[in-house]
């Protein structure tokens, strides 16, 4: 009986891994086609199939796209757009994750009068379409003198991502035993000591989830990038769109 159960368990595990591998191959296939096609010259693309390997490592298309491809009226390549995305994404991700951790810590473990109402308003922000806030955000950026700038994009992404990061951390910290906090308070630990010495060390899983979530959301965003950027602050998503429409 135990041998039969072990065999069924091994079969189910093998089936699970095969299913996951097939799913991964399905989603990675477009990336593979994109990479191998970018390494082919025009004749290879016309004569060979999409999945065939290139005859040689030809990086001319990469150099052209990076240095001198035309994105509208400018022909400076995608490099400026890439660095704009880097300077925009890293601060926005780090600040929104840190701020969300503090919000989640307060709303789950240091509840106060009105904390549930405040969390409900933040939760509403998770489901609000970004198109609804384009005009108000544009007005606020104008008042702050941050229109068409990297700093303005950082602020927009920070505020847009804060409801989600708060939700992640609040739900994660809600599972922390209250006795642990009570014991720390009895030992004289205050708000910041509990957060830095107890909560932060146990937050690695949710921190990684939030960092990945925020990075992908901000790096891949097009709406805010095209609405709030200027000529010198457009992110890579806008640059790629301009490149595709130019060529």
Language-model features: locations:
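A structural signal for multi-pass alpha-helical bundles of membrane permease subunits
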Residues: 3-6, 12-247
């Amino acid at each position: 009986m135990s041998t039969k159960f072990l065999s069924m368990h091994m079969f189910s595990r093998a089936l699970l891994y095969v299913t996951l591998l097939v799913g991964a191959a399905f989603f990675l296939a477009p990336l593979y086609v994109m990479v191998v096609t970018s390494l082919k010259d025009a004749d290879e693309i016309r004569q060979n199939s999409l999945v065939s390997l290139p005859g040689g490592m030809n990086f001319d298309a990469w150099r052209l796209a990076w240095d001198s491809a035309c994105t509208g009226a400018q022909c400076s390549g995608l490099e400026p757009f890439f660095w704009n995305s880097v300077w925009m994404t890293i601060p926005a991700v780090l600040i929104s994750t840190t701020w969300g951790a503090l919000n989640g810590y307060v709303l789950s473990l240091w509840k106060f009068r009105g904390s549930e109402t405040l969390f409900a308003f933040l939760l509403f922000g998770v489901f609000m379409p970004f198109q609804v806030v384009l005009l108000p955000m544009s007005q606020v950026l104008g008042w702050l003198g941050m229109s068409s700038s990297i700093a303005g994009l950082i602020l927009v992404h920070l505020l847009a991502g804060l409801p989600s990061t708060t939700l992640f951390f609040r739900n994660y910290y809600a599972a922390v035993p209250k006795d642990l906090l009570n014991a720390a308070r009895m030992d004289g630990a205050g708000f910041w000591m509990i957060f830095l010495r107890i909560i932060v060390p146990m937050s690695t899983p949710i921190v990684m989830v939030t960092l990945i979530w925020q990075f992908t959301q901000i790096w891949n965003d097009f709406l805010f990038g095209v609405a709030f950027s200027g000529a010198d602050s457009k992110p890579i998503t806008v640059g790629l769109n301009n490149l595709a429409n130019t060529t």
